[in-house]
Amino acid sequence: MKEEDPSAKNELSRRNFLKTGATAAAAFGGAQAAITTTASPAVASRDDDTSGTLVFVNGRIHTMDARNSIVSSVTVKDGRFTAVGNGAHAQGPGVRVINLKGRTVVPGIIESHTHFVSLANRPGYHVAQWELASNIAEVLELLAARRRDVPPGQFITAMGAGTPRMFAELRLPTLAEIDSAVPDRPVFLYQGGGGPARTNTLGKQFFESATAPLAGPCVVGADGSLTTVAGVNHANRALYHLRIRQTFEDKKRSALDAQAFSASVGITAVLDQTLVAVATGTLDPASLDPQPTHPLFTLNHYRMYDAWLALHREGRSFIRLQINFLHNQPFIPALGDLDHQLPELRERLKNQLFFFGDDMVRTGAIGEWAAPFATPSSPDNYAVWYESQRLVAKAGWRNENAQAGTPTSSAAIEQVVSTYEAMDREFGIKNLRWGLQHAAFATPDHLARLKALNCGVSMSGFTWLNGVPRADGLPLGPLYPQIIASGIPAGLHEDGVHIAPHNPWFAMHYATTGLNVLGQQINPGQQISRQQALYAYTRANAWYLNRENDLGSIEVGKLADLVVLDRDYFSVSDTDMRRTRPVLTVVDGEIVYDAGVLRGDRA
């Protein structure tokens, strides 16, 4: 469909926001890149206007075009690339030239499977950067840096993504350790998607006395731990107490923080798979509101984007968001026969608002599933899952399923592929670009059949975090070389921000080395090149988002998203490649992250 141009008012508002915002960077870990720790995320303060022509010169710019061209200069105007090549560049009033001095530049990274809306709704003053820390000292440094812009009495939080395996000590910080870094603000650290959690002294005092209509105080251990006690998950209860105290302005701040973190790791566009919806919302609308039992990955799926959309209307969003619609209703006996199942999905499919929006925010597909996956061994749930595929195909929407298979079985993938073939025979889906997420153990036969249906896959890259070597030596997947050799459009994703971090360089490191977070080989013989990994995260992911004509490569006419890196991703050691960070991120022709490294290199 034809994209709507943002209004002039919103463009001016966004440019002003980007121009006047400020970023504080905290460097840690020696050669580690700067990590942004802002309350009002934007770019490093600057006096120059962002509305003219922007020219990058003297770089190694990997365009990721069809020829894998590497050029030295690129010109950006009005949000698009207007010149890509070598030699002369635009000069004169309104032209800003940035001398890259040989730095590596790549297209903006596109994330094809994330749950970014969760990161954009975190209560408190959130520290997403804790996923980049490698030990407890670095976590504490990040918390202390964040405290500088947190008002008295307000929580500092760090949730999701982080697990003890990411830290050298293989544990979360204790109450005493958190107190040593932040003694005068309550702190709440929440592990993964469902806890446990850890707090400090002020947080302990709050949670042990907190009351609300649906829950009383939390049980907090002497070390600040919130775990499951007598069947009650007190990490989730604590999360509930924070969520119900969030204001709409708090949520807008959280959405800005999430976008700033995304820009700081080089992600310029996300395909959001939303969150696991409450299945009972149709029967009990009150269950959509925050509950003491809700984990981090559950929010009201009708209202979770409200704050982000408000920012977009104000012209203040700066990461491209594509929203999928995840529907999570299995067989519900109270709804009756099959014709009355799936009420939410049926309502969604009455409209044709897929791939609808503008360059910064648009809708996507049904995904990452239309109904919870079920096999024929559960007849009622299988019937509902199969019917959900029929409904999506009949309505002419794009559809996704997320199945990885296992090292010893690809039966679940076979069920998805054979069902897609049945949908094509009945309705015709070849022009809809249906997708398979994860796809770790898709066989050559599966891939050939999916390719014949004009489907694509998005390969998972998160196994490195919790995977351990198998006793039989089999790879944990994905089988990257096999998937890429099939010729099917194959993107790559991290699947943040609960079971894995948001940082894409971790996934690229895993795809190219097979090493887990502890340095163990868990995917033997299944490595791809760095060029292939970057292609999957840029050009291939653009195809997966149905945006290959606008995104994924640095070519004249495409939207101007690029990342200037702090090191040469292609030549540094594997260990250093994993630490890759941007020094400058550009979205829509505007600098949205600036580590300050290039400040002295501007002509």
Question: Where do the language-model regions lie?
Answer:
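Divalent metal-binding segments
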Residues: 46-57, 62, 66-345, 359-405, ...
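His/Asp/Glu-enriched, well-ordered alpha-helical/loop segment
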Residues: 393-404, 408-434, 438-440, 444-455, ...
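Acidic (Asp/Glu)-rich catalytic clusters
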Residues: 312, 349-361, 450-452
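N-terminal export leaders
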Residues: 13-30
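Signal peptide processing junction and immediate N-terminal pro/mature segment
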Residues: 33-45
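Extracellular/periplasmic ectodomains of large secreted or surface enzymes and adhesion receptors
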Residues: 595-603
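N-terminal secretory signal peptides
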Residues: 1-16, 38
